[in-house]
């Protein structure tokens, strides 16, 4: 038996990339993965490829959708939130709606999810939010990504205090070959990943397994709460 046997884990944003990898990992650890996504067809298709997984419609930017999605989930023991909406632009070129969408996906939505999940999670339950290395590496053109990721880290600490004994933590990935970079084309992707590897202290970029190992640990580490776990090969120091 593992610590996740018979547990039910909701992964919001679980229909692709890192979220889907998390769904597969918790299943292999003995849990039932509940794949939450705003694209119902993609969520259902993803669930078919993960043994025993369930799919539920959940739009993290719509509070009513969060409420109805949680109701359809039934029992939930842990929640992992991987959602994001990027708006990479210099401050002088920021778009109000895109900026708001980034905060909705990364901060406001997860806060609303915590609001409604607090009453259904068991005292031994947990929430894992996703921050990101950009928060610790100021870079022109990426301020919204950095600010929202930094806010996630602070949100984890404050939610851990308020929702205790439910544990809340954040995981901060670096550049991960998760599938999200495939749209660049193979040559451009490899050039990008090579550059990312050089920016770390361990001379490599991340794999999905690096992240899923961290998530599994946070889901089962009963004495860890309010923390941000950095999984980026020391990139924030380089």
Task: Tell me what each language-model feature is.
Residues 15, 23:
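N-terminal Rossmann NAD(P)H-binding glycine-rich loop of SDR-like oxidoreductase domains
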Residues 49-64:
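Rossmann-fold cofactor-recognition segment
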């Amino acid at each position: 038996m593992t610590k996740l046997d018979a547990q039910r884990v909701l992964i919001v944003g679980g229909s692709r990339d890192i979220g889907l990898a998390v769904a597969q990992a918790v299943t292999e650890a003995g849990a039932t993965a509940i794949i939450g996504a705003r694209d119902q067809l993609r969520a259902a298709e993803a669930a078919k490829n993960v043994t025993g997984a369930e799919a539920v419609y959940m739009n993290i930017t719509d509070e009513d959708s969060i409420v109805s999605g949680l109701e359809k989930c039934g029992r939930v023991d842990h929640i992992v939130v991987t959602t994001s909406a990027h708006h990479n632009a210099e401050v002088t070129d920021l778009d109000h709606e895109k900026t708001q969408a980034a905060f909705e996906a990364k901060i406001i939505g997860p806060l609303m999810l915590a609001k409604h999940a607090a009453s259904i999670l068991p005292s031994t339950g947990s929430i894992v939010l996703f921050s990101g290395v950009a928060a610790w590496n100021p870079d022109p053109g990426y301020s919204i990504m950095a600010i929202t990721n930094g806010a996630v880290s602070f949100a984890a600490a404050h939610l851990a205090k308020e929702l205790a004994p439910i544990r809340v933590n954040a995981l901060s990935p670096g550049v991960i070959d998760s599938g999200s970079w495939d749209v660049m084309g193979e040559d451009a992707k490899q050039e990008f990943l090579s550059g990312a590897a050089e920016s770390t202290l361990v001379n490599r970029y991340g794999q999905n397994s690096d992240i899923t190992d961290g998530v599994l640990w946070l889901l089962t580490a009963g004495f860890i709460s309010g923390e941000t776990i950095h999984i980026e090969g020391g990139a924030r120091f380089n």
